[in-house]
């Protein structure tokens, strides 16, 4: 299955709890942290919800 690189580029301070949960669900911990996740509808939904905090490649 295809993968997508996701990087946290903005802080989670003061963000909505749902958006923080999505970022945590993707496995991101700190600004600049990059993870490679599978390109599934579930992960795409989390990326779309918190898109303004992330950089997505691939």
Curated annotation (Swiss-Prot):
- InterPro entries, A to Z: Ribo_uL30_ferredoxin-like_sf (IPR036919), Ribosomal_uL30_bac-type (IPR005996), Ribosomal_uL30_ferredoxin-like (IPR016082)
The molecular function GO annotations come to: structural constituent of ribosome
What is this protein called in UniProt? Large ribosomal subunit protein uL30
How this chain assembles, per its entry, is: Part of the 50S ribosomal subunit.
Tell me which UniProt keywords the record has, alphabetically. Ribonucleoprotein, Ribosomal protein
Source organism of the structure: Azotobacter vinelandii (strain DJ / ATCC BAA-1303)
The Swiss-Prot or TrEMBL record describes its family as follows: Belongs to the universal ribosomal protein uL30 family.
Q: Which Pfam families match?
A: Ribosomal_L30
GO terms under biological process: translation
* CC annotations in GO: cytosolic large ribosomal subunit
């Amino acid at each position: 299955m295809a993968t997508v690189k996701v990087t946290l580029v903005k802080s989670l301070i003061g963000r909505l709890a749902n958006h923080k949960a999505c970022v945590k669900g993707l496995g991101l911990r700190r600004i600049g942290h990059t993870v490679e996740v599978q390109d599934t509808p579930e992960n795409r939904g989390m990326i779309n919800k918190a898109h303004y905090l992330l950089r997505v490649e691939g």
